Regions:
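Conserved NTPase motor "head" modules and their coupling/switch loops across ABC/AAA+ ATPases, GTPases
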Residues: 16-27, 501, 509, 547, ...
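Cytosolic, long alpha-helical scaffolding segments
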Residues: 420, 427-428, 490-506, 582
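Charged catalytic and DNA/RNA-contacting regions of genome-maintenance
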Residues: 11-346, 354, 358-374, 378-469, ...
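N-terminal amphipathic/basic-hydrophobic helices that include classical n-h-c signal peptides
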Residues: 1-12
Length: 626
């Protein structure tokens, strides 16, 4: 029994028979041979080896996992003449254990059974389908909803470097060229990547992160990286991204893409391009200044009493993440700042932000849902959340249309995708189960063949009632029951007091405290028919679901643009609400050098002190400096 209350499987395996002609090399069982072959590809990563309803770990991995996850370390028979250290976790609790590993900075290779067990046919085929690392997670349960989970790579050294970063859970892919280690540390402090990939032997030492992983020098070769990027984005060159003549930027971006392909082992269609972040477009804040200003984390590490904590009143997770990006990377462009200020002012007029916020509350995290659709890990409830979000779009459009020109401009274009919304309405039931493997996800009427296959299972209860009545008449047992459970299947139940009346053609299936359960040939035939139909129905339902994901995948790019627009509107509404609630005013931006504040208040201090804050004036110019 593990420390968390889950049972760990124990299996007996006899050691190979000894022989005088045995070689000195230990003989391993076929299962362990398969394990060693796969483990050789991932020597430094925990290998979670699927065996039935459990993921097992062996040898040194088992010892590590037992400590990291607080689960029981045991042994599994012998192989090669030695006991096999083993631990395991139930497959249905896998996400919880992955979350605990990721929080500790660990990675895990997920090895699945990719063929069905067939009696007499030897081992089932197994292969690693994905490597989960701290910087590549996409599951909702493993992510902080309002914080980006970034994977970054650094190329170069000295005065010429490039930093690339992306969030697999959203598809945002950025790169920035840097000129000093101090600039690198400033960006690391801002981005807080979950993993940072650097060139092995580069000598780069960073003081503000311990999430550094070395990659082989050949992986940073710009020629190979350029080829990978062109293939991913299906383009002839990188001119459109602005990095065609930037070999370090190409190397950093290419290393990220290579790492994703190595760990995810699937296409990444939601990575649509690379954006270059120009240093002169944003205010430079060094790492120490960022910490002292308590922008996203206080000096004690808390997030509550920070600038973001005070200004983030967003009602969606994706809006909250964009708000953090805006505050953490202040603009220098007066044109772009003026556009934001104008939009916030338009939303403040008549409290027009409130109707938008009310509708946006139920939109959900569309940005991350789209990424899961792209890598085909989206769950049924992801699709119902997307369906609801698409259903909200016409109402958001109506709110914008009801306002003036400035309000329409602030809201931006919000396409509704009526065809996709209608498809999701037809395809998915209102409240589906969590996983497609549980079945019961596709709505009745969506697929005629699926409806037919489900028909027999749904009518089984009527058959059982009639069959029970018939068997009572045949046997003369008035208390006889015909039923079904998931473990033993269909059964005929007879109490111990009527055992003498049980027909000889009944075969015992289960013994209870006060009754025996049987099955006969007729009920077995019915059971086989129903179970076959259920299996076929589930297979067809999975096929329908996969086809639905493919349809959504074809619209992934415009849907990503929609999620960006929703996030932008959400942040503008949040700023408008904060401006009203906290009595904040827009600054006047001028060409001359200086800073003039009248009745200024410190946004953090006034929120944490008990007595009213005393406003202060400040006037700085070229003759008056701090």
């Amino acid at each position: 029994l593990g420390g968390d209350g889950h049972y760990v499987t124990l299996h007996r395996m006899s050691p190979p028979a000894s022989s005088k002609k045995e070689s000195k090399q230990p003989k391993h069982t076929p299962l362990m041979q398969q394990y060693f072959r796969i483990k050789a590809e991932f020597p430094d990563t925990l290998l979670l080896f699927r065996m039935g309803d459990f993921y097992e770990v062996f040898y040194d991995d088992a010892k590590r996992a037992a400590k990291l996850l607080d689960i029981t370390l045991t042994t599994r028979g012998e192989s090669g003449g030695e006991p096999i250290p083993m631990a395991g976790v139930p497959h249905h609790a896998m996400e919880n254990y992955l979350a605990r590993l990721v929080r500790q900075g660990e990675s895990a290779a997920i090895c699945e059974q990719v063929s069905e067990p067939v009696p007499g046919k030897g081992l089932v085929e197994r292969k690693v389908v994905r490597v989960v690392t701290p910087g590549t997670i996409t599951e909702e349960a493993l992510l902080e909803s309002r914080q980006e989970n970034l994977l970054a790579a650094l190329a170069g050294s000295g005065k010429r470097m490039a930093l690339a970063w992306l969030e697999l859970a959203s598809g945002r892919f950025m790169v920035r060229e840097l000129e000093s280690l101090e600039e690198v540390e400033a960006q690391i402090e801002r981005l807080q990547p979950a993993e940072l990939l650097v060139e092995e032997g580069s000598g780069v030492v960073l003081s503000n992160t311990d999430r550094v992983h070395s990659r082989a020098p050949w992986k940073f070769e710009s020629k190979q990286c350029r080829k990978m990027l062109r293939e991913q984005f299906r383009i002839k060159d990188l001119v459109g991204f602005g990095i065609e003549d930037s070999p370090l930027a190409i190397s950093a971006a290419g290393v990220l893409l290579d790492y994703l392909q190595e760990t995810q082992r699937t296409a990444l269609p939601h990575l649509q391009g690379i954006q270059v972040e120009q240093a002169d477009e944003f205010m430079h804040l060094d790492a120490i200044s960022r910490r002292n200003l308590e922008i996203e984390a206080s000096m004690s590490g808390e997030q509550k009493h920070t600038l973001v904590g005070i200004l983030d009143s967003s009602v969606t997770a994706m809006g909250g993440r964009l708000l953090r990006r805006w505050i953490g990377n202040p603009l220098r462009s007066r044109v772009r700042l003026a556009a934001r200020h104008k939009a916030i002012g338009a939303l403040q007029a008549g409290l027009d932000y409130e109707p938008f916020r009310e509708e946006l509350r139920g939109v959900g995290d569309v940005e991350r849902i789209l990424s899961r659709i792209a890598i085909k890990t989206a769950r049924p409830r992801d699709l119902t959340t997307l369906r609801h979000a698409l259903g909200v779009m016409p109402r958001l459009q109506a709110i914008a249309e009801g306002g003036d020109k400035d309000l329409k401009q602030a809201a931006g274009e919000l396409p509704a995708f009526p065809d996709l919304h209608e498809l999701l309405e037809r395809a998915i039931i209102d409240e589906p189960p969590m996983l497609i493997r549980d079945g019961g996800v596709i709505r009745k009427g969506y697929d005629e063949e699926l409806d037919e296959l489900r028909g027999l299972s749904e009518n089984a209860s009527e058959f059982l009632l009639n069959y029970e009545k018939e068997q009572k008449e045949i046997t003369g047992i008035s208390s006889l029951k015909v039923g079904y459970n998931r473990v033993h299947g269909y059964f005929i139940e007879v109490t111990h007091t009527h055992q003498q009346l049980v027909p000889t053609e009944y075969t015992r299936r289960q013994t209870l405290k006060s009754a025996e359960r049987y099955i006969n040939e007729e009920l077995k035939v019915f059971e086989d028919k129903v179970m076959t139909r259920r299996e076929r129905a589930l297979a067809l339902e999975k096929h329908c679901y996969a086809a639905l994901l493919e349809t959504l995948l074809g619209e992934i790019e415009p849907l990503q643009h929609l999620s960006e627009r929703i996030s932008r509107l959400e942040v503008l509404c949040a700023f408008a609400e904060r401006a009203d609630r906290l009595n904040l005013v827009q600054p006047d931006m001028v060409d001359s050098e200086g800073l003039h504040i009248e009745g200024g208040r410190h946004p953090l201090v006034e929120q944490v002190q008990d007595e009213p804050f005393t406003p202060n004036d400040m006037h700085l110019d070229e003759d008056t400096r701090m």
